[in-house]
């Protein structure tokens, strides 16, 4: 199992897919990285040489913010928005959707499970 920027890459996957296991690297960045380092995206992780791993590690560390650094940066951005009291910060503080999505219905992921209020039944037909 190859280890890159603190992440174990799955041995049997193609390199293009395996790189997406690193937080901050998606399909596009994976292909970009492989093109820049001259490594074939069709290679499997188990077929990588130590030189290839070194090339990948150096390229990623030099050009992208990934894993812990990126997570810290995102958390700091959210904290800053909460502190300055902007609209997005208020939405984060209240645990509601931040980017303008509707909340009358849906938004269950952000709002959590429903909290039913007693005595709010709709009258039935007679």
Curated annotation (Swiss-Prot):
> Quaternary form?
Part of the 30S ribosomal subunit. Forms a loose heterodimer with protein S19. Forms two bridges to the 50S subunit in the 70S ribosome.
What is the name of the protein in this document? Small ribosomal subunit protein uS13
Q: Which organism is it from?
A: Acidothermus cellulolyticus (strain ATCC 43068 / DSM 8971 / 11B)
- Give the UniProt family note: Belongs to the universal ribosomal protein uS13 family.
HAMAP family to which the protein is assigned, alphabetical = Ribosomal_uS13
Region (Disordered) residue ranges read: 95-126
Keyword Glycosyltransferase in the entry? The reply is: no
Please name the InterPro entries in this protein's record. Rbsml_uS13_C, Ribosomal_uS13, Ribosomal_uS13-like_H2TH, Ribosomal_uS13_bac-type, Ribosomal_uS13_CS
Q: Which GO terms describe its cellular component?
A: cytosol; small ribosomal subunit
Function recorded in the entry:
Located at the top of the head of the 30S subunit, it contacts several helices of the 16S rRNA. In the 70S ribosome it contacts the 23S rRNA (bridge B1a) and protein L5 of the 50S subunit (bridge B1b), connecting the 2 subunits; these bridges are implicated in subunit movement. Contacts the tRNAs in the A and P-sites.
């Amino acid at each position: 199992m190859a280890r890159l920027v603190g992440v174990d890459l799955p041995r049997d996957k193609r390199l293009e897919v395996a790189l997406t296991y690193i937080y901050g690297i998606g399909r596009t960045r994976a292909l970009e990285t492989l093109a820049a380092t001259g490594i074939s995206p069709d290679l499997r992780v188990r077929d990588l040489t130590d030189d290839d791993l070194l090339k990948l590690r150096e390229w990623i560390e030099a050009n992208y913010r990934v894993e812990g650094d990126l997570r810290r940066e995102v958390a700091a951005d959210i904290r800053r928005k909460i502190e300055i009291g902007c609209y997005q910060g208020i939405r984060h503080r209240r645990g509601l959707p931040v980017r303008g999505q509707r909340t009358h219905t849906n938004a269950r992921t952000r709002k959590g499970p429903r909290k039913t209020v007693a005595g709010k039944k709709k009258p039935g037909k007679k």
